[in-house]
Amino acid sequence: MRIVSLTAAFIFSGSLMVCAQDVKPLSSPAQVDSLIGSYSGKVLIVNLWATWCDPCVEEFPDLVKLYQNYKDKNLALVFVSLDQPGDLNTKVLPFLKSNGVDFVTYINKFKKQEDLINAIDKDWDGAIPATYIYDSRGKMIGTLIGGKTYAEFEKVIREDIPN
């Protein structure tokens, strides 16, 4: 009986580990550059969003679906939440879990919002959702501001994703 209980506990704890969400702070321009550079060789989508932003919430499942459909073809997806860090456990983590996000995500911890804006794109006015797409060499190839659809995201990445 102990073996059954231990086995069940092990399996249950393992499933919790798979569902656990890793959210890291994003707090400096150097960290943004390093993050983008770390995906060299992959097409990278960086999406800035928040749980309080209706268009962000609406497009989120399309981005997750796009990632699931193309991750084996060198597509990477990075979410950066603009929620308050104090909302991490009550809003951000439950939202990520409900959308099946099982990869590292970031939360804005820049001291000033303007510093994050300048680190991402000096021409960005701070409106969200904001999605930046980089080719495999780290060159920005697309900027999508406002809520978008799966088809709109796919159109931008299609040229740079191998068949």
Summary of predicted features, one role per range:
Residues 127-163:
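Thiol-/selenol-based redox modules, centered on thioredoxin-like
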